[in-house]
């Protein structure tokens, strides 16, 4: 594994890591949203994997988070607490448009924290598919 992607910035983070901060804040329309990423390059054929650590304003249990995620469009929860009970980018996510969420658990270091493992096929679920989905929403809600 190479512990950085893209060029280093003055603050010690890389451009890729800062893009994660800016894009997350843009999606949530909240420039005060705190994001602390570390991007690494792992030699795989394709696929994105993220260990996501979030802190919420109010405590949410892993069970409640799982229930919410199971209702989210385009998300598949694969979260069994056993070997193989989690998604990987090369097996489960390969050639699918879904984003898989696994290893949903409460953060033992922060009362209002959750930890998730998230994977997707970045060739399928990326800018191209997102553009199509945005166009479909625009046509459905604003043009048709």
What are these model-derived regions, one by one?
Residues 55-57, 70-76, 86-144:
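C-terminal helical cap and adjacent loop that interface with cofactors, partners, or active-site loops
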Residues 1-71:
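Active-site-lining helix/loop region of Rossmann-like oxidoreductase modules
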Residues 34-36, 78-83:
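Flexible, glycine/charged-enriched surface loops at secondary-structure junctions
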Residues 9, 37-39, 84-89, 101:
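Sparse, context-dependent recognition of short Cys/His-centered cofactor- or disulfide-binding micro-motifs
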Residues 8, 42, 84, 108-111:
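A broad, structure-centric signal for solvent-exposed, well-ordered loop/edge residues
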Residues 5, 81, 105:
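Residues at the C-termini of beta-strands that transition into short coil/loop
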């Amino acid at each position: 594994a190479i512990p950085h992607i893209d060029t280093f910035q003055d603050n010690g983070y890389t451009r890729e890591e800062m893009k994660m901060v800016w894009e997350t804040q843009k999606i949530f329309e909240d420039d005060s949203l705190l994001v602390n990423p570390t991007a690494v390059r792992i030699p795989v054929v394709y696929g994105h994997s993220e260990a996501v650590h979030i802190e919420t304003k109010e405590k949410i249990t892993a069970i409640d988070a799982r229930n919410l995620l199971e209702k989210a469009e385009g998300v598949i929860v694969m979260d069994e607490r056993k070997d193989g009970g989690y998604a990987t980018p090369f097996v489960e996510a390969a050639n699918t448009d879904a984003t898989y969420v696994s290893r949903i658990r409460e953060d033992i270091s922060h009362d209002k924290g959750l930890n998730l493992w998230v994977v997707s096929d970045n060739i399928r679920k990326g800018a191209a598919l997102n553009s199509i989905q945005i166009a479909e929403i625009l046509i459905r809600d604003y043009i048709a």
